[in-house]
C-alpha cells in the first residue's frame, strides 16, 4: 500500500474499534433498561410461568445484533473518515479508492 492509504486506514480502524465498543455499551444499557421496566412474566395467571422473562434479547443472545451493530458502526465510521479526509485534501477520496482498488486487483 502507498503512503496516503495507510494513515486514514489506521485511523479509521482505530475509530471503528472505539465505535464498536460504544455501540455495545449503548445496546447493553438500552436492553438493561428495557428488561428492568417490562413486566417479568408472560402469563401472570399461571404460577408455573412466574419466572419467565418477556425480554431476553441481548447482543450476546441475538445473532443479528452481534453482526449488525459492529458492521453498521464500522461502515459509518469508515465512510465518515473517508469523507473528512477527502474534504481535508481535495480529490483524496478518489485517489484513495483508486489506490485501494489497484492494490486489491494487483496484489
Curated annotation (Swiss-Prot):
It is found in: Cell membrane. Possibly the antitoxin component of a type II toxin-antitoxin (TA) system. Its cognate toxin is VapC5 (Potential). The keyword Electron transport does not apply. The keyword RNA-binding does not apply. It comes from Methanocaldococcus jannaschii (strain ATCC 43067 / DSM 2661 / JAL-1 / JCM 10045 / NBRC 100440). One of its GO terms (cellular component) is plasma membrane. The chain crosses the membrane at residues 3-23, 65-85. The gene is vapB5. It is a multi-pass membrane protein. Keywords: Cell membrane, Membrane, Toxin-antitoxin system, Transmembrane, Transmembrane helix. This is Putative antitoxin VapB5. Signal peptide: none annotated.
Amino acid at each position: 500500500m502507498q503512503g496516503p492509504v495507510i494513515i486514514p486506514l489506521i485511523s479509521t480502524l482505530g475509530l471503528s474499534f472505539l465505535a464498536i465498543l460504544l455501540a455495545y455499551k449503548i445496546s447493553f444499557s438500552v436492553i438493561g433498561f428495557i428488561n428492568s421496566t417490562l413486566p417479568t412474566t408472560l402469563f401472570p395467571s399461571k404460577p408455573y410461568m412466574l419466572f419467565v422473562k418477556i425480554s431476553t434479547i441481548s447482543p450476546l443472545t441475538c445473532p443479528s445484533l452481534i453482526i449488525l451493530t459492529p458492521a453498521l458502526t464500522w461502515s459509518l465510521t469508515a465512510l465518515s473518515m473517508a469523507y473528512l479526509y477527502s474534504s481535508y485534501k481535495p480529490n483524496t477520496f478518489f485517489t484513495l479508492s483508486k489506490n485501494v482498488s489497484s492494490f486489491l486487483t494487483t496484489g
